[in-house]
C-alpha cells in the first residue's frame, strides 16, 4: 500500500486528530526506512487507532539483537497500556539485566488499548513484542509482571490475544513458559491456574539460573514438564502444578503440599543482599515515542523500608532496608540523563527521606545539572523526616 502525505495547506485544513495520525504515520515510515523493520500492524490499522506509536517499537535505547546468537527469547509483559508500563521501574531493570546476556533477547509487550484490541480479534492478529514485532506465542518465555490486582483481567487479555491457552494445564510443547512475578506474585494462588510458574522475590537474583536450566533442557531435548521440574528446584520458583492446595470455607488456605518428589515443601522469597553487587543499574533507559505517565528518569536509591506500616504491602515484602552507594548513584544519574535527554530525575524508594546520603545526593544533582534545567523529584517523603535546612 502506498500513502500520499498531504501538503502543508491540506494538512492545516485537517482536524487536529487527523493531523496527529499523519504525524504518527510519518514516524512509522521513518522507522521502517531507517531500520528496515517489519511491523505487525498494517498501515490501515496504524492510521485508525489512537496513539499508534504505542505499537511500533524502535524507541531510542530499545534493544535490537540478531537472532542467530540467541538461545532464549523472553517476551516481558506489563499488563497495562504502553504509557503506564513504560513508567514501571521493575520492568526496565529486568529488561536491562536480561539483555546484558548475549544469549538472551528480552522484548517488551504491553496491553493494547480497546480500539486495537477489537481490531486484533476481528482480524486474527496475535499479540506481538515491540522490538521484533514477532508474535508472543513464538517466544520461549512470557514473563508477566503483577504490580497490582487490578491488572489481573489484563493478564487474561494478554494470554487470549497471544493465542496461548488460558490455563497452564491446557498448554503444550509449542507454548511459551508463562511466568508471573512482581509484588502480587507473593500471593500467587488467585492466578495459579493461568501460570506455569511464579518467581517469588526480587527479579535480579535467580533468573540467570532459570535461563541456564532452560538452555540445558532445550539442548538435551527435554520436555516442558522436565524443565518445570528442574525450575521448581531453583530457590524462589513456585510451580503450581506440583503442589496440592486445599482451602477452608472462608477461602483461606488450609494446606499446601508438594505432589512431586524433589520439589521443596516451602518456596522462600529471594532478594538481593548487597545492592552494590547484585544490582544491575540502568545506563540507557528506553525513551518512549509518546509521553509516559511518569515522564522522567527513575533512580532507585534504596530498597525496602524501616517504617513497617501495617497497611503497606511493599514495606513488608521488600524488607530488609538496603541502600545503594551514593557514588554509584551519582554515576547512574549522569549516565541516564545523558543517554535519555530527560529533564527530570526521580529518586525512588519507599521512603526517600530515610536514605542516609539524601542531602549529599540532592546537592550533587542540583550542582551537576543546574545548567541543564533538570528537575528533581522526591516521592514517598514523610512529613516527620524534614529538616529546616
Write out the residue ranges for each language-model feature:
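Iron-sulfur (Fe-S) cluster-binding segments and ferredoxin-like electron-carrier domains
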Residues: 312-328
Amino acid at each position: 500500500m502506498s500513502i500520499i502525505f498531504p501538503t502543508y495547506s491540506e494538512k492545516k485544513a485537517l482536524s487536529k486528530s487527523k493531523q496527529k495520525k499523519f504525524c504518527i504515520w510519518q514516524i512509522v515510515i521513518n522507522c521502517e526506512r531507517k531500520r528496515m523493520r517489519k511491523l505487525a500492524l498494517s498501515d490501515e490499522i496504524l492510521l485508525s487507532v489512537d496513539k499508534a506509536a504505542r505499537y511500533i517499537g524502535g524507541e531510542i535505547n530499545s534493544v535490537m539483537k540478531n537472532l542467530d546468537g540467541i538461545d532464549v527469547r523472553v517476551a516481558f509483559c506489563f499488563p497495562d497500556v504502553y504509557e503506564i508500563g513504560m513508567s514501571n521501574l521493575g520492568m526496565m531493570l529486568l529488561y536491562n539485566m536480561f539483555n546484558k546476556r548475549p544469549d538472551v533477547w528480552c522484548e517488551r509487550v504491553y496491553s493494547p488499548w480497546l480500539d486495537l484490541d477489537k481490531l486484533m480479534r476481528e482480524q486474527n492478529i496475535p499479540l506481538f513484542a515491540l522490538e521484533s514485532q514477532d508474535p508472543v506465542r513464538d517466544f520461549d518465555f512470557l514473563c508477566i509482571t503483577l504490580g497490582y490486582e487490578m491488572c489481573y483481567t489484563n493478564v487474561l487479555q494478554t494470554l487470549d490475544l497471544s493465542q496461548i491457552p488460558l490455563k497452564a494445564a491446557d498448554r503444550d510443547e509449542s507454548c511459551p513458559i508463562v511466568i508471573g512475578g512482581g509484588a502480587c506474585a507473593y500471593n500467587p494462588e488467585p492466578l495459579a491456574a493461568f501460570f506455569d510458574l511464579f518467581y517469588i522475590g526480587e527479579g535480579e537474583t535467580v533468573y540467570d539460573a532459570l535461563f541456564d536450566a532452560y538452555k540445558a533442557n532445550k539442548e538435551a531435548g527435554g520436555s516442558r514438564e522436565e524443565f518445570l521440574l528442574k525450575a521448581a528446584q531453583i530457590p524462589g520458583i513456585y510451580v503450581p502444578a506440583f503442589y496440592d492446595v486445599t482451602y477452608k470455607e472462608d477461602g483461606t488456605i488450609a494446606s499446601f503440599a508438594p505432589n512431586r518428589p524433589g520439589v521443596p515443601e516451602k518456596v522462600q522469597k529471594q532478594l538481593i543482599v548487597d545492592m552494590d553487587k547484585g544490582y544491575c543499574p540502568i545506563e540507557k533507559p528506553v525513551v518512549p515515542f509518546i509521553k509516559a505517565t511518569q515522564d522522567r528518569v527513575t533512580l532507585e536509591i534504596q530498597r525496602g523500608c524501616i517504617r513497617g506500616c501495617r497497611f503497606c504491602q511493599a514495606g513488608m515484602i521488600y524488607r530488609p532496608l538496603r541502600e545503594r552507594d551514593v557514588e554509584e548513584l551519582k554515576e547512574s544519574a549522569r549516565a541516564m540523563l545523558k543517554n535519555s535527554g530527560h529533564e527530570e530525575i526521580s529518586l525512588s524508594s519507599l521512603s526517600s527521606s530515610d536514605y542516609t546520603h539524601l542531602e549529599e545526593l540532592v546537592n550533587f544533582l542540583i550542582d551537576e545539572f543546574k545548567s541543564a534545567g533538570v528537575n528533581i523529584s522526591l516521592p514517598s517523603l514523610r512529613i516527620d523526616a524534614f529538616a529546616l535546612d
